[in-house]
Structure formats: structure tokens, C-alpha cells
């Protein structure tokens, strides 16, 4: 199973007590049922594929990202706190965190493997450390 420098930085940045269980579970993962599908032309066009059945999370990752970002350029541009369900590849949240008006981006996810994938793909360490990005594994609270 792969582990990147991004993952190590993100785990180190998850320093609060609220991340104790999630960090432990992420570090103990032994098998992944997903892999990345990269587009050599555009890194934003990154998909996640289920290894067992070949299903992709996105039909058109780049187009779906651009559509998802659009409301945050207009009507939600100044929202200080925004909530989402589903981490996907994480690129949407990395993009939204560029807007300093978004003081908190809270992401609920029920699949720990997808959290693992996103934390390996992108460096969220600064946002995790300062609390601008909050990742919640739903099963920790149900």
C-alpha cells in the first residue's frame, strides 16, 4: 500500500484530540480498494477508481470540479464556514481553501479509504493544523 509525504505531513498536522481515532485508523489501514487515475495533461483531472469493479468516482473529474466551484465564486464566496459530505479526491477543498473568507471547511466522509486517498494526493497540512479544514469520519460519530 502506498503512502506519500503528503500523507505524513497531513497526519502530523492532525494534532488535536478530535483526530486521535481517525489518525489511528488511517495509519492502521492495510488494504485499499481504490487507486488513482491521473490525466497526464492536467493534474486537476484526477479520478479515483474502485479496484474491484472499475467504477470511477467521477465521470469527468475536471468538468465536475469546475461545476462544483462555480457557486463558491458567486453566492457562497463570503461564507465563513461551509460543510460538505464526501471528500472525493480532495481537489475541491484544496481549491476552496485558497479563499481566505472560508475560515472553516468541514468535510464529512463515511469511507476511510477515500480520506486516505485524499490525504495522500494533496498537502492539507497547513489547513488541518490551523483548523481551516476539518475532516470527520462519520462512523466515529454514529
Label each region the model flagged.
Residues 1-142:
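N-terminal donor/sugar-recognition subdomains of glycan-related enzymes
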Amino acid at each position: 500500500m502506498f503512502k506519500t509525504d503528503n500523507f505524513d505531513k497531513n497526519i502530523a498536522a492532525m494534532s488535536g484530540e478530535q483526530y486521535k481515532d481517525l489518525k489511528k485508523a488511517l495509519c492502521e489501514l492495510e488494504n485499499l480498494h481504490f487507486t488513482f487515475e491521473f490525466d497526464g495533461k492536467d493534474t486537476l483531472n484526477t479520478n479515483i477508481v474502485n479496484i474491484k469493479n472499475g467504477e470511477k468516482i467521477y465521470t469527468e473529474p475536471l468538468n465536475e470540479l469546475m461545476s462544483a466551484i462555480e457557486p463558491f465564486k458567486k453566492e457562497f464566496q463570503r461564507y465563513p464556514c461551509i460543510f460538505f459530505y464526501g471528500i472525493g479526491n480532495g481537489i475541491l477543498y484544496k481549491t476552496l481553501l485558497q479563499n481566505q473568507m472560508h475560515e472553516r471547511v468541514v468535510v464529512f466522509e463515511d469511507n476511510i479509504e477515500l480520506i486516505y486517498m485524499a490525504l495522500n494526493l494533496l498537502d492539507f497540512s497547513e489547513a488541518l493544523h490551523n483548523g481551516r479544514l476539518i475532516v470527520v469520519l462519520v462512523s466515529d460519530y454514529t
